Structure formats: structure tokens, C-alpha cells
């Protein structure tokens, strides 16, 4: 349901109107229970069909098993958990929701810097198909710039999101380099070296696929860039990895 706030509405009154829980309405809309509402504000309100009150000794895994669900699905249906798997006795979980038939499938990718906060990362991972650590830069000679992506890859695997390796021309100064792109695209030996290192890195770290992000490529090199991406795709597809 979409509820438009009227004068006198509170989270509690809105939740009661839709047979929902105030804490769920708050979490699903990025609010806290003490956040003041504004007249005309639109809120998403979901009506739980089945609720489960956590008992002593229960875990997210045990509850998911009891209802024949995956932990990932249970986390998705309880955004207020923000991805945390540690439950407290008395927590109320939504097992399913009324009138929520699947509409289809959707693939969702998110980019993350290595320094992203753990709480924010864990809160979104249950909803992601892919997580892409940002970013592996390159030198003109076709050498990958290192990326401290171990934590991101570990969290992605824990929450069932596939990891994509991000290849770009971003420099340590934070700018996309046309010069680095041009040097690489006109040097077959550098491309071969880069391709070999990409394959090695993906195999070592367990990356699912590759995301190529070269920005500000000179117009006269557009065909060289297309050929380079085709070369990457051919080599990685042979290893079962998408580009």
C-alpha cells in the first residue's frame, strides 16, 4: 500500500490502519519511530501475513528452516534487521506478506568503495544480485592497480551476492584518464598482459564476471575500444564469466 500522510497521522495509527507494525513501516521508509511525519508524505506500508516472535535459542537460520525459506529471503522481508543475523528474544519477524505476488525477476548491481561502512553494506547485500567493488585501475603498460577488496568479496559471498570485477581508467588521483585508455588500446602487448592478469585475479578472488568502465575514451579510438571489449568478452566467456 502507498499511504499519503494526513493531519494527525502517526506511524502507529498508519500501521494499525493497514494491519502492519510501526517498526516495519518506519524501517521500510528509512525512518525511526520518533521521526516526525509531514502532511502529504507518501509511505510504503506492507501488511504481514505471518509473524514470528523470536524465542530463546532461535537463530535466523533455524527460523528460516522452520518456514522453508532461505536466510536471504528472511532478511529481505525484514528490512529493520539491516542485514544483521543476530536476533534478540522478542524480535518480531515477518515471514510473508499479504497480497504480494511476485511480479517477475530483477537483477540489481551496486558499486561499493572498500571503505564502505559495514552496517550500510550488510543492510543492502540481501537485496543485491551483484556487488561490484570500485575499482581496479590500469597503467598504460596494462598493469592492474591493486584494490583492497577482500572484505567486500567476503561479505558478498556470505549474503549470496555475486561479485563483479570493475575495470576502469580511474587514476589514484580520482580522475578517469584518456591517456591511459589510449596507451592501452593502441598496445596489443599491454592488452595481452592485462587480460592475463585479469583472468588470474578473477580466478584467485572468485569474481563472477567483469564490468568494463572506460570513460572519456577519445572518439577516434572507439573501434579500438570495441575490439578490446570483444577480446575481453571472448576470453572470459571461454572461462564461463560474463562481461
Predicted region positions:
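Soluble periplasmic/extracytoplasmic beta-strand elements of cell-envelope proteins
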Residues: 3-6, 42-46, 53-55, 73, ...
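Chitinase-like catalytic core of GlcNAc-active glycosidases
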Residues: 102-114, 125, 139-243
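Short acidic beta-strand-loop surface patches of small beta-rich interaction domains
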Residues: 26-34, 75-83
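Flexible loop residues that form catalytic
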Residues: 79, 98, 136, 215
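Short, structured interface segments
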Residues: 29-47, 86-98
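Boundary/entry segment of secreted carbohydrate-active catalytic domains
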Residues: 49-52, 95-120
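Solvent-exposed, polar/charged alpha-helical surfaces in well-ordered, non-transmembrane soluble domains
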Residues: 12-16, 23, 61-65, 72, ...
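Primarily a LysM-type cell-wall glycan-binding module
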Residues: 1-19, 41-68, 91
Amino acid at each position: 500500500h502507498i499511504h499519503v500522510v494526513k493531519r494527525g497521522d502517526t506511524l502507529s495509527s498508519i500501521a494499525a490502519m493497514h494491519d502492519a507494525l510501526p517498526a516495519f513501516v518506519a524501517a521500510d521508509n528509512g525512518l525511526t519511530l520518533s521521526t516526525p511525519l509531514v502532511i502529504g508524505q507518501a509511505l510504503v506500508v506492507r501488511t504481514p501475513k505471518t509473524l514470528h516472535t523470536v524465542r530463546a535459542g532461535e537463530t535466523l537460520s533455524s527460523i528460516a528452516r522452520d518456514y522453508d525459506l532461505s536466510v536471504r529471503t528472511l532478511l529481505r522481508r525484514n528490512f529493520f534487521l539491516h542485514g544483521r543475523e543476530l536476533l534478540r528474544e522478542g524480535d518480531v519477524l515477518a515471514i510473508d506478506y499479504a497480497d504480494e505476488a511476485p511480479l517477475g525477476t530483477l537483477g540489481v548491481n551496486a558499486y561499493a568503495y572498500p571503505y564502505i561502512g559495514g552496517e550500510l553494506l550488510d543492510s543492502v547485500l540481501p537485496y543485491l544480485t551483484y556487488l561490484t567493488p570500485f575499482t581496479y585501475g590500469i597503467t598504460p603498460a596494462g598493469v592492474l592497480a591493486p584494490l583492497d577488496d577482500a572484505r567486500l568479496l567476503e561479505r558478498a559471498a556470505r549474503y549470496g551476492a555475486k561479485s563483479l570485477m570493475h575495470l576502469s581508467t580511474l587514476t589514484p588521483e580520482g580522475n578517469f584518464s584518456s591517456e591511459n585508455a589510449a596507451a592501452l588500446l593502441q598496445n596489443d602487448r599491454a592488452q595481452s598482459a592485462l587480460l592475463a592478469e585479469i583472468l588470474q585475479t578473477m580466478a584467485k578472488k572468485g569474481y563472477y564476471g567483469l564490468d568494463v568502465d572506460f570513460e572519456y575514451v577519445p572518439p577516434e579510438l572507439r573501434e579500438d575500444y570495441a575490439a578490446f571489449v570483444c577480446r575481453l568478452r571472448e576470453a572470459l566467456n571461454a572461462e564461463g564469466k560474463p562481461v
